[in-house]
Swiss-Prot record:
Reactions catalysed according to its record: UDP-N-acetyl-alpha-D-mannosaminouronate + N-acetyl-alpha-D-glucosaminyl-di-trans,octa-cis-undecaprenyl diphosphate = beta-D-ManNAcA-(1->4)-alpha-D-GlcNAc-di-trans,octa-cis-undecaprenyl diphosphate + UDP + H(+)
Pfam families in UniProt: Glyco_tran_WecG
Bilayer-crossing regions: none
GO MF, one example: lipopolysaccharide N-acetylmannosaminouronosyltransferase activity
Protein name per UniProt: UDP-N-acetyl-D-mannosaminuronic acid transferase
Pathway(s) this gene product operates in, as recorded in its UniProt entry: Bacterial outer membrane biogenesis; enterobacterial common antigen biosynthesis
Native source organism of the sequence: Escherichia coli (strain 55989 / EAEC)
Length: 246
């Protein structure tokens, strides 16, 4: 068996994370032996670690997800500090989603898209079909009423989707995925936040060099100064990291 179909796990503050070496490792793991895994993918960054710490419901939701991976460079550095021999790298959720969509297009895997503004969702569908010939079997923008959720779950189930990506922000998307899986368990679910906006060019992502240097957070802060309160909140995570309270 190819070693890439397996992955070690690491624990940070009680949360178990999958340790992928790189993007190829992540893809080989999720498509082990040609079969797409079923379960829920959740990207973990420092901000989400803080939310998990402070919100018991979110912690329970995320703990229940099968595939929690290091999306933030701070989390990667913490894993490396706690486990010096760990061969783990950041796998950005936006990049993983694109790679999954490209693979789905190649293999004809049925995909259902949830979330985003109606116009952004429509552009996402069109681009996915044009770029990778993705087999999109259904979609629903993020503007639906609570009483419409059950009917949406039934639509997703009837579509036969094997990948369901949900762009509703955390923890709404995690709650949605948990509840939808009760109706349609046989799929890989992925919470993708604002990925559709980035994919369609409505939101500009940090240049590659900033990403490589682990400074994507700084680029976002410079682009959106209103994020300063969110960034200051992360000082608590830095304290955990530098005091070894991991």
């Amino acid at each position: 068996m190819n070693n890439n179909t397996m992955a070690p796990t690491y624990t940070l503050r009680g949360l178990q994370l999958i340790g992928w070496r790189d993007m190829q490792h992540a893809l080989d793991y999720l498509f082990a032996d040609g079969h797409l895994k079923q379960g829920t993918l959740v990207a973990i960054n420092a901000e989400k670690m803080l939310t998990i710490e402070d919100n018991a419901e979110v912690r329970e939701l995320i703990n229940a997800a099968e595939f929690k991976y290091a999306d933030g460079i701070s989390v990667v550095r913490s894993v490396r500090k706690k486990y010096p021999q760990a061969q783990v790298s950041r796998v950005a959720g936006a990049d993983l989603w694109e790679e999954l969509m490209a693979r789905a297009g190649k293999e004809g895997t049925p995909v259902f898209l949830v979330g985003g503004k109606p116009e952004v969702l429509a552009q996402t569908e069109a681009k996915l079909r044009n770029q990778w010939n993705v087999n999109i079997v259904g979609s629903q923008d993020g503007y639906f009423k609570p009483e419409q959720r059950q009917a949406l779950f039934e639509r997703i189930h009837a579509s036969g989707a094997q990948i369901v990506t949900v762009a509703m922000g955390s923890p709404k998307q995690e709650i949605f995925m948990r509840d939808c899986r009760l109706v349609h368990p046989d799929a890989l679910y992925m919470g993708v936040g604002g990925t559709y906006d980035v994919f369609t060019g409505h939101v500009k992502r940090a240049p590659k060099i900033w990403q490589t240097l682990g400074l994507e957070w700084l680029y976002r802060l410079l682009s959106q100064p209103s994020r300063i309160k969110r960034q200051l909140r992360l000082l608590r995570y830095l304290r955990w990291h530098y005091t070894g309270n991991l």
